[in-house]
Amino acid sequence: MNPYWLEGLAAQTPALSGEHGADVVVIGAGLCGASAALALAEAGLNPLWLERGFVSVGASGRNAGFVLQGTAERYSRAIGVMGRERARRVHGWSRENHLAMADAVQRFGIDCGYQRRGSLQLACAPEEEAELLESAARLAEDGFAADVWSGADLPACYRDAGFHVGVHLPDDGELHPARFVRGLAKAAVEAGAVLHEGTAITALDAQGAGDVTIRTSSAAGTGTVRASLVVVCTNAYAGEILPFFADKVDPVRGQMLATAPVAPLFGCPVYADHGYDYWRQDEAGRIVLGGWRNLDPASEVGTAEVLHDGIQARMVEFLHRFPALREAPITHRWSGTMGFSRDGLPICGAVPGAPGVMAAVGFTGHGFGFAYLAGQAMAQLVVEGRSDFVDAFSARRFAV
């Protein structure tokens, strides 16, 4: 298994061992953890930052690199589940997240191939077409750009593959996910964050704010950190160190592949079949394709990053629906573990039953739609004691 985005990457900072103290500890060096560490460092708090593997090695470096607005549900469904006003507010948070990420690319000069070409949602069946059209109408009514493409408006490559209707969302974007996260990490360390990669958390004992003990293990030996506050940004793995999340965030595996570079074909990231199928063509010309876990959902649960032969084969069959891709060599295959919350929304803020510990997890396959802002919100919670974002996605909604 060879994740395309992670080629040649490894830990660049020493593992932690021995006894340490810290005012604030951040656990996890994906997008959310990098954002939190950066914001805390810029606030002058110099957080101690721990990562089991290396920066971006988890889902943040194994996804398709989409920067999308909204949740995993189409907007019309989101309205049906959470109500019009809350759906509008949540969608607005994801738009703000994208704008903040774009600002970070510019501010820190991150070379990550960021582009804002929009995204395209395609329908695979008549009922999905109706849902797409309804979502486009509701988005427009609520002030979000959405353009219906059908007939000649839909590019020929999609019509030739059997698609008839799509909705283009012009405010969405794309990037090289690992490069973006590592660019944030570099900025965080330069601002004062103290990063230790290759450092696994073996225990977290929260006696109260100001009295949290973290025990670690690494190639350098065991370690103990006594912290005043801890920010957990481990998404799918949160339940391993915080029992509160064991029945609230499920680890769900996603299959991915990439081809050798081919001639330009797709103009923006694409979602189809209610988001179960997704692909894009990156700046190097490679087709990066993922999804199809609905073919065998029971087996795609868990944290083992393994390939599913049947799903991988189905992904190749799908590629061959596009004549220009029938001879494209597959150069990379990999999987990654996402954290799906029980209600499809991020879970942020103080962790019930763990005083002194806060978390931002459960991004449900849309980490690049929410996690950057979530990390900033966690830092705001530490520094100022409150955050509107945290209020919107508080873990308290499960503590009833």
Please report, for each region that a protein language model flagged, where it lies by residue.
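N-terminal Rossmann-like FAD-binding beta1-loop-alpha1 element of flavoenzymes
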Residues: V24-W49
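C-terminal catalytic lobe of FAD-dependent flavoproteins
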Residues: D171, A304, H320-V400
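Flavin-dependent oxidoreductases
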Residues: A203-I287
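Extreme N-terminal leader/targeting segments of oxidoreductases
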Residues: M1-V24
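Helical element adjacent to the flavin cofactor pocket in flavoenzyme catalytic cores
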Residues: A130, A137-R138, G166-A227
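Flavin (FAD/FMN) cofactor-binding and adjacent substrate-gating region
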Residues: N2-E7, E73-I79, D103-G183, A191
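Active-site lid/adjacent beta-loop-alpha segment flanking the redox-cofactor pocket in flavoenzymes
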Residues: A263-G356
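Glycine-rich FAD pyrophosphate-binding loop
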Residues: E42-R62
